[in-house]
From Swiss-Prot:
GO molecular function, one term: protein-phosphatidylethanolamide deconjugating activity
UniProt xrefs under Pfam families: Peptidase_C54
Domain of life: Eukaryota
Record bears the keyword Nucleus: yes
Main location: cytoplasm
Alphabetical UniProt keywords: Autophagy, Cytoplasm, Hydrolase, Nucleus, Protease, Protein transport, Thiol protease, Transport
Name this protein carries in UniProt: Probable cysteine protease atg4
Stated family: Belongs to the peptidase C54 family.
EC number of this enzyme: 3.4.22.-
Enzymatic class: hydrolase
Function per UniProt: Cysteine protease that plays a key role in cytoplasm to vacuole transport (Cvt) and autophagy by mediating both proteolytic activation and delipidation of ATG8. Required for selective autophagic degradation of the nucleus (nucleophagy) as well as for mitophagy which contributes to regulate mitochondrial quantity and quality by eliminating the mitochondria to a basal level to fulfill cellular energy requirements and preventing excess ROS production. The protease activity is required for proteolytic activation of ATG8: cleaves the C-terminal amino acid of ATG8 to reveal a C-terminal glycine.
Active site residues of this protein: 133, 307, 309
GO biological process: aggrephagy; autophagosome assembly; mitophagy; piecemeal microautophagy of the nucleus; protein processing; protein targeting to membrane; protein transport
Length: 404
């Protein structure tokens, strides 16, 4: 076992043995943001004496315990929003994803994944544990973008159950589901140089989302990918967002970027946190050394995230029109908060924005211009910018290296 594997295993062991839920004590008077919605500190949290049905906490084993109110409690409205975000995690016992033979294909796998593929999953991968975290983070980003379109930004867990179940079925762990891990791996092998059992980086994940959305044939959502730069070209975006009749269609912007070498350079901190405050935000995938997460919120210098590194049984395949059970849908949600200081994040990430209409696009452009600190996004008018436009983009962030 190499030092990277040992270090990764050590971190996971520590997390399982000591995994306290964060308290609202780092920036208790600062606003909390969750995908563009602002929540103010709950001044009355410490006066509650009667627990409500949501006054619980989830531990790492998945069990739920009563959470005693305290002066460091989180605003209830924020927790309701957080637990309504769709949370994709590792799954096991799904139909096998065929292995690709060859020494060069297994060289980039971790030791644990190689051993599992040789001793357990000999006919193919029946779990993405140990290698699918970036795919799951990307699925989370896409699922929440679709949720905002189909269910609305104000939708909360438990409402419109049938529609949520139908949305989740798009991500079922079967070869036929439009956004399954099987489809991600298939396109990754065909077009991105990523093979079963290998980590995906932000760039490969973005390209898979773009391709699978197109293959799905659903006109609900278009996808614009920045091609490993921090630049967004207005002419290219409009070509994608407008249909043949010129009408604007909801479009997901995916920006793969790297904001530093080993950590995020401090000059980018404000720009990164601001991205989660935009009403167009659908979160950030990546951003954790050797372990991708899905970031959905921020408070002060900390970011809140959903962790895909929990393995659950794959849901059984459903016939068309058949719904998941409440218990099955509940595995896609958690009330368990996790946070990280921005200085501890990995600089390689995939940032997502959902542009619903022309007015949304104009608002997003204004917000990009108003961000404090060094910009993490540059908007240019044309794919082939002239000299003046290039001069305005000299202060660009580093291009994405698709290595986790």
């Amino acid at each position: 076992m190499n030092t990277v594997d040992i270090g990764r295993c050590s971190k996971r062991i520590v997390q399982y043995l000591w995994d306290p839920e964060p308290r609202n004590d780092e920036d208790p008077n600062s606003s909390i943001w969750c995908l563009g919605i602002e929540y103010h500190p709950d001044k009355d949290a410490n006066t509650r004496e009667t627990p409500d049905k949501n006054n619980t906490r989830e531990n790492v084993m998945g069990t739920t315990n009563y959470r005693k109110p305290s002066e460091h409690a989180w605003p209830e409205s924020f927790l309701l929003d957080f637990e309504s975000r769709i949370w994709m995690t590792y799954r096991s016992n799904f139909p096998p994803i065929p292995r690709v033979e060859g020494d060069d294909k297994s060289a980039s796998m971790t030791l644990g994944v190689r051993l599992r593929s040789q001793l357990v999953d000999t006919q193919g991968f029946t779990s993405d544990t140990g290698w699918g975290c970036m795919i799951r983070s990307g699925q989370s980003l896409l699922a929440n973008a679709l949720s905002m379109l189909v269910l609305g930004r104000d939708w909360r867990r438990g409402a419109r159950f049938e529609e949520e179940s139908q949305l989740l079925s798009l991500f079922a762990d079967t070869p036929t589901a439009p956004f399954s891990v099987h489809r991600f791996v298939k396109h990754g092998a065909e077009s991105c140089g990523k093979y079963p059992g290998e980590w995906f980086g932000p760039s490969a994940t973005a390209k898979c989302i773009e391709a699978l959305s197109s293959q799905c044939g659903n006109p609900t959502l278009k996808v614009y990918v920045s091609n490993d730069t921090s630049e967004v070209y207005q002419d290219k975006f409009m070509d994608i967002a407008r249909n043949t009749s010129g009408a604007f269609q909801p479009t997901l912007i995916l920006l793969g970027t790297r904001l530093g070498i080993d950590n995020i350079t401090p000059v980018y901190w404000d720009g990164l946190k601001a991205a989660l405050q935009f009403p167009q935000s659908v979160g950030i995938a990546g951003g954790r050394p050797s372990a991708s997460h899905y970031f959905v919120g921020a408070q002060g210098s900390h970011l809140f995230y959903l962790d895909p590194h929990y393995t659950r049984p794959a849901l059984p395949d459903r016939q068309e029109g058949e719904l998941y059970s409440k218990e099955e849908v509940d595995t896609y949600h958690t009330r368990r908060l996790r946070r990280i200081h921005v200085r501890d994040m990995d600089p390689s990430m995939l940032i997502g924005f959902l542009i619903r209409n022309q007015e949304d696009w104009a608002d997003w452009l204004k917000r990009i211009e108003a961000v404090k600190g060094r910009p993490i996004i540059h908007v240019l008018k044309q794919m082939n910018p002239d000299h003046d436009q290039e001069a305005g983009a000299l202060d660009q962030v580093e291009a994405l290296d698709d290595i986790e």
